Amino acid sequence: MKKLVIALCLMMVLAVMVEEAEARWCFRVCYRGICYRKCRGKRNEVRQYRDRGYDVRAIPDETFFTRQDEDEDDDEE
């Protein structure tokens, strides 16, 4: 019985690892008014972009390149 429980636990851990490796994490990255989609297999990449000062939001897969209003850049001139 103990071996069965251990085997089931190992199978669950393996299934989670495989699912994690195959998952695509898509998010929108915006910087200076330009937004684009990034899809990677790493969850922590979102945090890395956020730490660098980018505006990062989760988006659906069908979202494509967009450009925000130019009003943000007008302030710099």
Swiss-Prot record:
Keywords, A to Z, come to: Amidation, Antibiotic, Antimicrobial, Cleavage on pair of basic residues, Disulfide bond, Secreted, Signal
Cellular component GO terms held in the UniProt record? extracellular region
Q: What GO terms in the biological process aspect are recorded for it? A: defense response to bacterium
Source domain of life is: Eukaryota
Q: Which residues carry this modification: Arginine amide?
A: R40
Which residues are trimmed away as propeptide when the chain matures?
41-77
Q: Which residues form the signal peptide?
A: 1-23
Where it sits in the cell: the answer is: Secreted
What tissues is it present in?
Answer: Hemocytes.
Q: Which cysteines bridge via disulfide bonds?
A: C26-C39, C30-C35
Family of the protein in this entry: Belongs to the tachyplesin/polyphemusin family.
Q: What does this protein do?
A: Significantly inhibits the growth of Gram-negative and Gram-positive bacteria.
Q: What is this protein called?
A: Tachyplesin-2
Q: Which organism is it from?
A: Tachypleus tridentatus (Japanese horseshoe crab)
Its ancestry begins with: Eukaryota, Metazoa, Ecdysozoa, Arthropoda, Chelicerata
